[in-house]
Regions:
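Active-site beta3 strand of CheY-like receiver
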Residues: 64-70
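Short amphipathic alpha-helix used as the core "switch/output" element in two-component signaling
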Residues: 59, 81-94
Length: 143
């Protein structure tokens, strides 16, 4: 039977992403936040909020209205990996999908992020297509 949304036969590989989901972008570099926000907007995601580090992001997350977290690794205050660990340790936040967007391409750091529970990892610089692919893969996996 064909999928009604896409006409796919068997397993539908297209993911229906909620374009209105609220996305928190965390990066200490305002230009990078703007780049990510613009790329997300180009992909149809316009409901974004921003924080400049993990310390600023946590209160926003604790309000409970964020559907997806995009965070840098290297930030002053609380780093992205520390933020990820806080999210995974919090009963209300532990299922929140998290994408790490960072210049850190070392194998050890990718492994550390995976062990801390990241859902996806993109190394800067990246394209809108790479970002779209990562987001789709994350939401395919979490179903």
């Amino acid at each position: 039977m064909a999928c009604p949304a896409h006409g796919c036969v068997k397993d539908c590989l297209e993911v229906e992403l909620d374009k209105n989901m609220k996305i928190l972008i965390v990066d200490d570099f305002s230009t990078m936040r703007r780049i990510i926000k613009n790329l997300l907007r180009d992909l149809g995601f316009t409901n974004t909020v921003e924080a400049d580090d993990g310390t600023t992001a946590l209160p926003i997350l604790n309000l409970g209205h964020i559907d997806f977290l995009v965070t840098d690794w290297n930030m002053p205050g609380m780093t992205g990996i520390e933020l990820l660990r806080h999210v995974r340790a919090d009963e209300k936040l532990k299922h929140l999908p998290v994408l790490m967007v960072t210049a850190e391409a070392k194998r050890e750091q990718i492994i550390e992020a995976a062990q801390a529970g990241v859902n996806g990892y993109v190394v800067k610089p990246f394209t809108a297509i790479a970002l779209k692919d990562k987001i789709e893969k994350i939401f395919e996996r979490i179903g």
